[in-house]
């Protein structure tokens, strides 16, 4: 029998670290584009007794007994995911976005097959063919990028590379791209060479669910996403697809037993909650505000003389190039962090610096919008960022901004006390 004691009583060292992180989230402004704050209901599911249950297999086809209630939970998540995104197929078992992506590769490709994906240096993701990832090591990865004049995806280059290399799969999606992706253009290119089209919409899934960003699910052969970021659920993954019995069977077996063992049932339950939350009327208003906030911040920073890659944003994020100011992303990250503004350093197209230093930062608005910030607050925030960057990290300026950050964080708490 377990002793009925708290973490603080049993493990004060760990408890203190958790307490400190709770305080940090309340006292810092979160602008990392891939982060958000999930609801208390999502966290309740994550911390439930479901964490005790093993459930290898799928609803009605388990390798373990005692799964009758787990089956209900997983089926709820599946049905809600399909309804939310207009999908014919959903697999809610992937532990994370990268695991969802690796399952797609396993399902549709053989080692050595050619894949065409977006370059990490131009806004793609590790799993889109980067040399340091399984996707670039196991497969012959060809990379496309942005048009240097427009800062947008160079679809002519995508088509040229596709016709030249004949990839078996084209990957569309991004981790740092601020414009609307033309999913149909990718479909047309893929069809010219008989390739699969795989879309990774991890960053914009919440926007897609709310109808404020184009939905790729019925255009692509397979679509994946994380369930956090803009979707505002648990840190986990999801695979979606339009009707295709052959692909569905391959995806099922690629997730289990091909890529994973049993699902994390507590995370599956949390996904079911997050999908239901995304069906609420207020969710669309939230996602619309996310985009408005990102656009407002980009406008202010452009007015202050900073370069935004592709000239602005039509989603939840943008890349700020600091090449003109001769500021490294690493320094900008540190200076802003000292003022309790959390961003991440990020490479920009044709970046002369290494990925560990970079010449830019990535800014996203999902978390601050969850917190309740509107355009007035984020315009102030963008001005504070510019103040710190203009001063090259002057301590007095950082302290002045930090005081303003503390005041606005107190006004807009993440979670009710």
From Swiss-Prot:
> Keyword Metal-binding, does the record have it?
no
What broad class describes the main subcellular location of this protein? cytoplasm
User: For this protein, what is the EC number?
Assistant: 2.1.2.1
Which residues, renumbered to this chain, carry the PTM N6-(pyridoxal phosphate)lysine?
Answer: 229
Q: Which reaction does it catalyse?
A: (6R)-5,10-methylene-5,6,7,8-tetrahydrofolate + glycine + H2O = (6S)-5,6,7,8-tetrahydrofolate + L-serine
Specify the enzyme's EC class, one word: transferase
Q: What is this protein called?
A: Serine hydroxymethyltransferase
Q: Which gene encodes it?
A: glyA
């Amino acid at each position: 029998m377990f002793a009925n004691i708290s973490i603080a009583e049993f493990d004060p060292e760990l408890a203190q670290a958790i307490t400190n992180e709770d305080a940090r989230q309340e006292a810092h402004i979160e602008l990392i584009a891939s982060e958000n704050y999930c609801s208390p209901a999502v966290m309740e599911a994550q911390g439930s007794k479901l964490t005790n249950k093993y459930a290898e297999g799928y609803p009605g086809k388990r390798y373990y007994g005692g799964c009758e209630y787990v089956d209900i939970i997983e089926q709820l998540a599946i049905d809600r995911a399909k309804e939310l995104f207009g999908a014919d197929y959903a697999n809610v078992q992937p532990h994370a976005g990268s695991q969802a992506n690796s399952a797609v590769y396993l399902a549709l490709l053989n080692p050595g097959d050619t894949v065409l994906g977006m370059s990490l240096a131009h806004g793609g993701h590790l799993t889109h063919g980067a040399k340091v990832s399984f996707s670039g090591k196991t497969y012959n990865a060809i990379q496309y990028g942005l048009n240097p004049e427009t800062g947008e995806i160079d679809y002519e280059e995508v088509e040229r590379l596709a016709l030249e290399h004949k990839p078996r799969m084209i990957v569309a999606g991004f981790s740092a791209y601020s414009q609307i992706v033309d999913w149909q253009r990718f479909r047309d290119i893929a069809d010219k060479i008989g390739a699969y089209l795989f879309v990774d919409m991890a960053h914009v899934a919440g926007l897609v669910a709310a109808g404020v960003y184009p939905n790729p699910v019925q255009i692509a052969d397979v679509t994946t996403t994380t369930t956090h970021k803009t979707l505002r659920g648990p840190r986990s993954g999801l695979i979606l697809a339009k009707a295709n019995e052959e692909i569905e069977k391959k995806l099922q077996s690629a997730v289990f037993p091909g890529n994973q063992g049993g699902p994390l049932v507590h995370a599956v339950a949390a996904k079911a909650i997050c999908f239901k939350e995304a069906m609420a009327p207020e969710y669309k208003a939230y996602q619309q505000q996310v985009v408005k906030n990102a656009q407002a911040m980009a406008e202010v920073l452009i007015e202050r003389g900073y370069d935004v890659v592709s000239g602005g944003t039509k989603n939840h994020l943008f890349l700020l190039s600091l090449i003109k100011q001769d500021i490294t992303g690493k320094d900008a990250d540190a200076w802003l962090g000292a003022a309790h503004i959390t961003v991440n350093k990020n490479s920009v197209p044709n970046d002369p610096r290494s990925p560990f230093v970079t010449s830019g930062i990535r800014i996203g608005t999902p978390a601050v919008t969850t917190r309740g910030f509107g355009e007035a607050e984020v315009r102030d925030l963008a001005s504070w960022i510019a103040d710190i960057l203009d001063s090259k990290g002057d301590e007095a300026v950082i302290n002045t901004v930090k005081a303003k950050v503390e005041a606005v964080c107190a006004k807009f708490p993440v979670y009710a006390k």
